[in-house]
Amino acid sequence: MRHRVAHRKFSRTSAHRMSMLLNLCISLIKHERISTTLPKAKEIRPYVEKLITIGKVYKEKNLVYGKRLLISKIKNPDIADKLIGILSVRYKSRNGGYTRIIKNGFRKGDSAPMAIIELVDRQIITVESNKNS
């Protein structure tokens, strides 16, 4: 029975697991959309949501402590700046639910269930091609 088991282990040591989840969180915040396996996407969702909420709270209070807290958690000052500067403004009126998980079939090599995890309300840039045929 799996009573009181909070997180997935992914067959890794705890240091490797935390490093992997941290890298996935940083990639998601940086690119705003990543493709990964479904269990990994489900596992990083609460971490990313908490990071965005921390950025929102400390942006409103205008405290330096918030940026230091984010840097201590994610070890990347550029991502902390993006959380406080861009994402906290984008999600100012939203109370949670900053991410979306879309199932994306199965991986060809090992049939692992794949998913796309993305930040909602993101700017989608479209490139129009000039066809003069």
From Swiss-Prot:
Part of the 50S ribosomal subunit. Contacts protein L32. NCBIfam families: L17. Belongs to the bacterial ribosomal protein bL17 family. This is Large ribosomal subunit protein bL17. GO terms for cellular component: cytosolic large ribosomal subunit. It comes from the Bacteria. HAMAP family: Ribosomal_bL17. InterPro entries: Ribosomal_bL17, Ribosomal_bL17_CS, Ribosomal_bL17_sf.
